[in-house]
């Protein structure tokens, strides 16, 4: 069995692409391939690493998260996936209209005018 261990020195972005069951039913595989193909097309392979995972935002499926900026994207279609690579990864500009969360040094916050659901609190109350 072969095990892959990537050397990520020099990597500028890590994109976590949701491939959980909800995301897969809503185009997660297509979004994954669109991101990876556009990264290759723009010769960004050395700067961008992608990982398939479940991001826990099923209502916003499919979801992609870009680090180090901490931007969470919702409903990533092939078109949005291409824009994430072209405008965010290559161009440095977030797609504000597609954000669920962005990072502001205090933590993740929902952008103004977000239509995404708030979700379930991760911290259990003592009540």
UniProtKB/Swiss-Prot annotation:
Molecular-function GO terms, alphabetical: 2 iron, 2 sulfur cluster binding; metal ion binding
Residue pairs linked by disulfide bridges in the UniProt entry: none
Alphabetical list of InterPro entries matching this protein: Thioredoxin-like_sf (IPR036249)
Domain of life where this protein originates: Bacteria
Cofactor note: Binds 1 [2Fe-2S] cluster.
Alphabetic keyword roster: 2Fe-2S, Electron transport, Iron, Iron-sulfur, Metal-binding, Transport
KW Kinase (keyword) present: no
Family of this protein: Belongs to the 2Fe2S Shethna-type ferredoxin family.
Name the record gives this protein: Putative 2Fe-2S ferredoxin
Organism name: Priestia megaterium (Bacillus megaterium)
